[in-house]
Amino acid sequence: MSPRRRVLLLSMVGLLLAGGAIALRVGARQPAETSALAESLAGIEAPAPTTTTTSTTIDPARQSFRAAHVGIPSVNLYPSAAASQPQLALPNPTDENVPLVFLVREEQGSRLKVAIPERPNGTELWVDKTDVVTTDVPNRIVVEVGARRLTVYRGHSDEAVMSATVAVGSDATPTPLGDFYVDISVAQTSYTPWILSVAGFSDALQSFGGGNGQIAIHGWSDTSVLGRNVSNGCVRVSFDDLWRLRDLAPVGTPVEIVA
């Protein structure tokens, strides 16, 4: 496993949450899983090629966001829309055997500027449009750390479709602030029935449980912790709210964590 992307060691047989920051364990992807991923991406129409060189940020009036699903085994990421040499290459599936997904921030000509699940927080690079398949994402998540509240909004609007009291990081291991996104959504069998991995990393923990301190939104059976600062950086929700989140926040959903 590369030192760059030892974030989540995902497993369908075990999850070590140990209070907040996540460390997941899994075996190799089965051929059927890889085939299913290929089939699902094959059914999505790829974006039409374009020759324009005008830089366009995502329209604030747009009622959805865009996720970029990588469609090749290894994807190059560039420091600018015009760069000829890549700055980074990421495997797909990832080292954790899960599909690689980005959040689209901007587009220019034949490339998209995307947020990626890498340290440091807020890293954004450019990817060729031909290397990804984009899908619309309907909602966004806002986590208010001080209020210990999570709200799901419809698109860019102020229309709330869900609100929940949550537990957040302790004073020693605070939940990081910033603009992130859901990069993995997967069932688990220990501590939480489902987990939404967030492409953000703890500022206090450079490593945790075999990973490098990536945070997540996950369920917690003891609801007495909700409304408190008790985790190692993750956002804990009740199981009932977790199921609602799973349906409202597919991969690529923006996650804004504010004070």
What are these regions (language model features)?
Residues 1-17:
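N-terminal export and membrane-targeting signals
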Residues 63-65, 70-74, 99, 109-111, ...:
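Extracytoplasmic
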Residues 22-34:
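Hydrophobic single-pass membrane-insertion segments
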Residues 94-130:
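SH3/SH3-like beta-barrel superfamily modules
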Residues 34-38, 43-46, 56-103:
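Beta-loop motif signature
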